A protein has these predicted regions:
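Short amphipathic alpha-helical boundary/capping segments
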Residues: 1-3, 106-107
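Short capping segments at the starts of secondary-structure elements
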Residues: 3, 15-22
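Pre-recognition alpha-helix immediately N-terminal to the DNA-recognition helix
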Residues: 8-13
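Alpha-solenoid HEAT/Armadillo repeat architecture
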Residues: 15-16, 31, 90
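DNA-recognition alpha helix
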Residues: 23-36
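Basic amphipathic alpha-helical segments that dock to polyanions
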Residues: 43-53
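Non-DNA-binding regulatory cores of transcription-related proteins
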Residues: 57-62, 66-128
């Protein structure tokens, strides 16, 4: 596990952003912070490394990335995503994950990855 300077910087950018961030936004912030222009494939390779090693998650529904605040503790979690402000919450529920795996097994299906994204509205946006 080699945590290169580029991987470290991209991880820091994602964690500090506090909201889901898209790859090209990461590229822009990386250039701004380091003063160096990276090419998109460099950013995507670092993102792939961070996902594969459990440091970040990809939110497919909004094509963005978020930090994992308990890396390597689990592989399956679900996300609550506000459709208005894009704030998210990472949640874990072992029973939910077990039920997904049981349901898949009954259908002769082997799950390799589970990311459940639930869209709705956060309390702050509801109150506005």
């Amino acid at each position: 596990l080699v945590f290169t300077e580029i991987r470290q910087k991209i991880f820091e950018i994602i964690i500090k952003y506090k909201k889901p961030i898209k790859a090209y936004e990461i590229l822009d912030v990386f250039t701004e912070v380091t003063g160096k222009r990276a090419h998109p494939p460099t950013i995507y390779r670092a993102i792939d490394f961070l996902i594969e090693n459990g440091f970040i998650h990809k939110l497919n529904s909004i094509n963005s990335y978020v930090g994992c605040f308990h890396p390597k503790v689990h592989k399956e979690c679900y996300f609550l995503i506000c459709k208005i402000c894009n704030i998210y919450q990472e949640c874990c529920d072992k029973n939910l994950t077990e039920n997904i795996f049981k349901s898949a097994n009954k259908r002769d299906f082997i799950v390799s990855n589970t990311t459940l994204e639930i869209e709705g509205h956060c309390n702050d946006c509801i109150q506005k």
